[in-house]
Amino acid sequence: MESLQKIDLHLHLSRIPLPRTEQMWVSDPAEMLPHMAELGIQKAVLMSTSENSQPQMPFGSNADNRAIAQADPSHFAWMCNLDPLDPDTIPERLAAYKAEGAVGIGELCINRRLDDPLLEKIFAAAGELELPITFHMSPEVGYSYGIVDDPGLPLLECALQKFPKTKFLGHSQTFWIEMSGDAPTEKEARNQWGKDSVAPGGRVPELFAKYPNLYGDLSANSAGQAILRDPAFGLEFLETYADRLFFATDMVNAGMTFPLGAWLDEQTAKGALSTQAYQKICRGNAQRVFGL
């Protein structure tokens, strides 16, 4: 199979080198680019951590990511983020970030329930401005970062119905654990990767079948395990929804890799995943939906 240069729809970087430890660090573009090349990634979309630089998160602000993308547009694009303030100015702020080059909103992590008025303002404006949203989901307000939904994702379904023009990209454990019909309901278990075979009746497949504005960010081990836990089911899901799934990594440094990318390569090489689905997931959808 001819090598395909992937587009990674979910990457975190620091604009400048930061202090590092052996356990954790955030790469800058110079360090990440060779790693991307090793993984067959030609371009990556940067996730913003905040609208404005904050001491507790000294990397990944809108301004930082905009600067990275403007300095090297052949390798980087960026999504903007919003801080939870001034709801009435949300449309204007998002329009300004789009004018500055933002291709979407992400990753949206405001720790409020999905039907919160501020989040609904974001969803509405995103639809009007044609800015897709990559969201991180949490099982409970105050438990972990991310927008919040209940077991079974009832609030997400309401949002998909209420904002049909808005493209929602699901991400994180609490979203992808709902791939299986036996998804847990306890908050700790909802924040874990899925294990074992996928049981029928999962809410993620059901919502994908019902709502064409639901998309999937295939990053990290949350999405990786959703696919790899049951390879036969995973391959069927990839084929069925190939138009709405995006290869992504969620890497923050050049020491990280996730297994799904190589697995997609292997499955396509042996004919288990169609070349058409592979090309859409790994590159074509990002080009079509985000204009990359």
Language model region names:
Residues 1-43, 95, 242-246, 252-292:
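Mid-to-C-terminal alpha-helical segments outside catalytic/metal-binding sites
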Residues 1-23, 61-81, 204-205, 211-215:
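Mobile, glycine- and charge-enriched loop segments
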Residues 6-9, 45-48, 79-81, 106, ...:
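Active-site neighborhood of phospho(di)ester-bond hydrolases with catalytic His/Asp-centered motifs
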Residues 17-27, 51-60, 83-89, 110-117, ...:
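Acidic-and-aromatic substrate-binding clefts and catalytic sites of carbohydrate-active enzymes
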Residues 23-25, 30-54, 75-83, 103-107:
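Divalent metal-dependent hydrolysis catalytic cores, especially in the metallo-beta-lactamase
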Residues 31-35, 61-69, 93-97, 118, ...:
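A general structural detector for well-ordered alpha-helical segments in enzyme core domains, enriched
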Residues 56-151:
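Active-site gating/metal-coordination segments in enzymes
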Residues 103-104, 119-247, 255:
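Catalytic pocket-lining loop regions of alpha/beta-barrel enzymes
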